[in-house]
Amino acid sequence: MAQPSNMFDTFETVGLREDLADVIYNIAPEDTPILSAIPRAKATSTKHEWQTDTLADAAANAVIEGDDATTDALAATARVHNFTQIMDKVILLSGTQSAVDAAGRADEMAYQIAKKSKELKKDMEFALIKENLSVVGTATAARELGSISTWIATNGSAGASGGALSAGFNAATGLTRATASGTDRNITEDILKSVIKDVYEAGGDLDMFVVPPSVKQTVSTFNANTTRFGPAGEKVEYAAIDVYSSDFGDIQVVPNRIMALTNEKMCFLLQRDMLAAAYLRDFSINELAKTGDSERVQLLVEWTLEMRNEKAHGILLDINQ
């Protein structure tokens, strides 16, 4: 049906205001399950050091009445270290861009700072998860922290051709070592239970199982030992609260989206208080020198992973995602 004669409609109108919602919708994931769950610590040098120790195994102990005391052997602590890594995000906005009226935000620089801050934390989570050996650094090469997988030497399970765990701190070089790649396999409850037992026997008290999303779906099929609630009143910074009830205690099963990006085929069994994020320079926002009609801001953090005792943790290698 045609319009009546001389109809004036929106197709001819000049000066209609643009209809642009004054809200920006962003659903990109920003959660950082490991970084948000572990404690913070203070680093005072680019080479962040700490000590680890252990107890002797239990043994028979009976002393003859009236006998002279026999001195026990003493063992020295182990001194280990990781290097701080500088991470940043830099924003450059023209003076005009800062002045114009932009939809969805009152201040373009403030909006970009908030956005880049979240991205910086995601990069930190990536650094914990992606296999990365520690690097001393030089005037031409950045210092790098040794990631979680490069520290765990005692408790773990690798694919058929992977053999014994090869990672861990190398006292001779002062650097962390890489894991050995094995045959890819699907996660099973037997694999999980085996590593949990190894950690328990080594003295660990696991409370967190971090997995890629697809592996989380498989773990959820371990119906006999999985519940969908957490400790009453506990406040956590990650969404999932599924709990795997092992023979040695309850362990929260936490899906990690960033794990899917690394393609490392790893899952971590962690005792949260036995690792920390150690900050040499905490998060800061620095206005850089003005060189023209623009504003330049740097978001910066310098930090490292403090693996307080690798025997408290476990790793599942060569797990299909």
What residue spans do the PLM features occupy?
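Flexible, glycine/threonine- and acidic-rich loop/arm segments that mediate assembly and lattice contacts
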Residues: 1-321
